[in-house]
Regions:
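ATP-dependent phospho-/nucleotidyl transfer catalytic cores
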Residues: 79-81, 101-158
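Active-site loop/lid in soluble adenylation, ligation, and acyl-transfer enzymes
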Residues: 2-120
Length: 158
């Protein structure tokens, strides 16, 4: 199982390590835009992303937020725990920007009185649509308890 490619996405490749609970995550120099429609490479992107990711996960550890991160043996690699992937992206907004402006006709930069939490289905083919909790549960992408925990952690990290 060691060094067997388990998954490849737009930004990372996951390899088996011989331990079924641990994967090697290798960052890629590939860059994409438009849900993967535009592709190119950027020298050292993998090492920059790995370094930033490492610092974020180490900081989260100091806040007692559990993550999949174990260690970073190389400039573009991390050992991570094997986890169940929930295909949901959690976005917290303090100010209007991006898709929320287009969806609701809000001017960019408008501040919100309280952080807004939105959930999106991670699916490039569908352009990562906004999704409701009932749909997430009905489609078995996450349970109500998992959603509650995701939202709680998102607010802590925010």
């Amino acid at each position: 199982m060691e060094n067997l490619k388990m998954y490849e996405g737009k930004a990372k490749v996951l390899y088996g390590t011989g331990d079924p609970n641990v994967l090697l995550m290798q960052f890629k120099d590939d860059i994409t835009a438009g849900d993967g429609a535009k592709k190119d490479t950027m020298t050292n992107k993998s090492s920059l992303n790995c370094t930033i990711s490492k610092k974020i996960f180490e900081h989260l550890h100091t806040l007692n937020v559990d993550t999949h991160y174990i260690s970073s043996p190389e400039v573009n690699e991390q050992f991570v725990r094997a986890v169940k992937i929930i295909p949901i992206e959690v976005v917290i907004r303090n100010f209007a920007a991006g898709s929320i402006c287009r969806r609701y006709g809000i001017n960019k930069g408008v501040g919100f009185s309280t952080p807004l939490l939105e959930l999106f289905l991670k699916n490039d083919d569908l352009h990562d649509p906004l999704i409701g909790e009932d749909v997430i549960v009905e489609m078995n992408w996450a349970t109500r308890n998992e959603l509650r925990e995701m939202k709680e952690r998102a607010h802590i990290v925010h």
